[in-house]
Amino acid sequence: MKLTRKMVLSRAKASELHNVRKLNCWGSQLTDISICREMPSLEVITLSVNSVSTLEPVRSCRRLSELYLRRNRIPSLNELFYLKDLPHLRVLWLAENPCCGTSPHLYRMTVLRNLPHLQKLDNQAVTEEELTRALMEGDEITAAPHREGAGNGCPKPPYALNSVSSATETSQHLLSYTEETEVQGQTTTDQSPSFSPRDTMRSHKNRNILTAILLLLRELDTEGLETVQQTVGSRLQALHRPEPQEDME
């Protein structure tokens, strides 16, 4: 099913697409969200429990801060390429998609390496330690995924809430929907006060420097690594050395 202008305006209670800031399309059997290209003011969108297979339309939503895509058909983490230029994206829920693969650790590290500005991934807070590890343990995505044809996915949604679904499965969907909406409320009202603009800028600068250092370390031989180790040790000792206190007489 295609997300249409009429559906968007009705759900968002808006008169024009460019005015839409929040949109909830949870469990709507959607396969095509190309209309997102016409919503530059969009800040929060819920697309969980659908059959969306590409993130390309979302790349036009430059103000997007929260993206909920749990239980869709995102095939590959290469789709993250379309999110890398969204400067305000802080919350992403991508769990239960084919792109998550069989290694939860590699999945999380790869997402965080490519989207280091995230503060929450799959309803779990992102830590500075994770961001540092992601530089070494995550895969870097540098190109858009190759696509055959221009379709937005198969017409038969795997997670549609239809008559075939069992009562248990439906109740689980509804419970997860309630949980997801609660999370949205929390992130809207409490945007991690520990991240001040100055702290965020300093953190990004440190991460960029660390990335460069880690990449250069791969090129060093044993002798070079030993030199780096000695230099780092001396630097740490200097930083931890207590400053001399002046005598107060």
UniProtKB/Swiss-Prot annotation:
Chief location bin: other
GO cellular component, one term: plasma membrane
InterPro entries for the chain: Leu-rich_rpt, LRR_dom_sf
LRR repeats mapped onto the chain: 19-40, 41-62, 63-84
Domain LRRCT positions: 97-137
Segments for region (Disordered): 146-203
GO terms for biological process, alphabetical: cilium assembly; cytoskeleton organization; DNA damage response; regulation of cell shape; smoothened signaling pathway
Compartments in which it is found: Cell projection, Cilium; Cytoplasm, Cytoskeleton, Cilium basal body; Mitochondrion; Cell projection, Cilium, Photoreceptor outer segment
Keyword terms: Cell projection, Cilium biogenesis/degradation, Cytoplasm, Cytoskeleton, DNA damage, Leucine-rich repeat, Mitochondrion, Repeat
Biased amino acid composition, Polar residues: 162-175
Quaternary structure annotation from Swiss-Prot or TrEMBL: Found in a complex with CFAP410, NEK1 and SPATA7. Interacts with NEK1.
Name this polypeptide is given: Cilia- and flagella-associated protein 410
Organism of derivation: Mus musculus (Mouse)
Gene for this chain: Cfap410
